[in-house]
């Protein structure tokens, strides 16, 4: 079955929508390393409807990021429809994705995100309202249920399909699980069997091999990578190697990791325009990019104190110089 937007490969790889991570700079990096489709951070429909300028700034993207979806969350069908119409006019992404999966307390306390899963009639009203407000394809991201007592991903997925969802991503955990325990890939397989639209698998993809394993286990139409991409955009290229039957490219050496981190930082600074703010917000990314390199803990200790990316670059340069001396000794 076909996706309602261009995907580039028979089995597309998606960068998941993640607050504070799936911003335009990292989306560009992920696309360069092989992500077929990217999705924005989740955006408040209420904020969009109110015309909050910073949200429209957050939704900006470059043509190189396409295909891209803008993800909206909210619990009021009328407001969601208004926001979808405004996003369509202002941004014209390739699709609108509805967030029925976010487990964060500040979102679900107003029945947004996975809070909507407690009321499947509301889920359907939201999907129909958004679909009627835009000419763009409408897709959804769900969890397996609110809790174990209400865990029924097939029923949730079928209701979404009935309401008009054109593709569906399942994170195979409940809201109460948050990110604990294991994602139940068997549930993804059951949803795949139950629907006639593309089903994207999500949950517990930490390596390229996990992508191949998920496809084999579930029969999903694509894989969405979330935390496995943190500081690791190479996961997309390595997964594509495996899917294509090619030898898998090796993990990057420290110099490649550092160069990519700095490229990511330059993109972030271009978007942010504030050297110190960019550096402070980028510390988490530096921690992820340096995971697994020799002496990582001492390196991160220094990187977590930077107040400019020039300081980070100097730290990386000194690290590589010491490494070269040690290898020559």
Show which residues each predicted segment covers:
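Active-site beta-loop-alpha junctions enriched in small/polar residues
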Residues: 18-20, 43-45, 73-75, 101-103, ...
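Glycine-rich, positively charged N-terminal anion/phosphate-binding segment
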Residues: 1-9, 18-94
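Alpha/beta enzyme core
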Residues: 81-112, 120-197, 217
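Alpha/beta catalytic cores of nucleotide-metabolism and tRNA/nucleoside-modifying enzymes
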Residues: 1-10, 14, 19, 24-25, ...
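N-terminal small/glycine-rich loop or linker at the start of catalytic domains
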Residues: 2-14, 48-67, 102-112, 127, ...
